[in-house]
């Protein structure tokens, strides 16, 4: 069963965005960039160069900034004020809801060509406990499919 599609978008601490007068163009062009290197050879995983160029923006220092080896580390670094990260929506949502992270939604979301699935062996019915977990995960994933976050 498909649970949710994944997407990425720029995310940063509210304080950093305020330092840029709330202007996302300034933020992504001047603040340090946080690079998630967990999928460096995956053509579906967007990087800063691709994200910026699709929006007609440029930076001469694309490789500078923090390089992290896991997508949740990118979210944590952005929350800590280390710079702007391309964060996965599913990992950033909780911090966004709490106000610890702000994300660029309008024209900033890049959908990834992959989804999270819940799998079970074909022809084997789920136990009551497994069904409860499957229902819980499906319900938790629902806001991502309807909100785009």
Language-model segments: residues:
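Structural signal for conserved beta-strand scaffold positions within catalytic alpha/beta enzyme cores
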Residues: 2, 35, 67, 103-105, ...
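Hydrophobic hinge/microswitch elements
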Residues: 57-104, 111, 126
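Secondary-structure junction motif
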Residues: 32-55
């Amino acid at each position: 069963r498909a649970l949710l599609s994944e997407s990425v978008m720029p995310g940063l601490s509210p304080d950093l965005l305020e330092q840029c007068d709330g202007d996302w163009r300034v933020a992504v062009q001047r603040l340090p960039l946080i690079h998630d290197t967990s999928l460096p050879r995956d053509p579906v995983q967007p990087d800063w160069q691709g994200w910026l160029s699709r929006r007609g923006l440029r930076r001469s220092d694309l490789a500078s900034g923090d390089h992290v080896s896991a997508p949740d580390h990118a979210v944590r670094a952005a929350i800590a004020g280390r710079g702007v990260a391309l964060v996965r929506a599913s990992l950033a949502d909780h911090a966004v809801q709490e106000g610890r992270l702000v994300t660029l939604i309008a024209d900033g979301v890049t959908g990834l060509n992959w989804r999270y699935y819940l799998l079970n062996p074909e022809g084997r019915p789920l136990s009551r406990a497994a069904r409860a977990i499957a229902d819980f995960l499906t319900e938790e994933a629902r806001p991502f499919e309807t909100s785009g976050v």
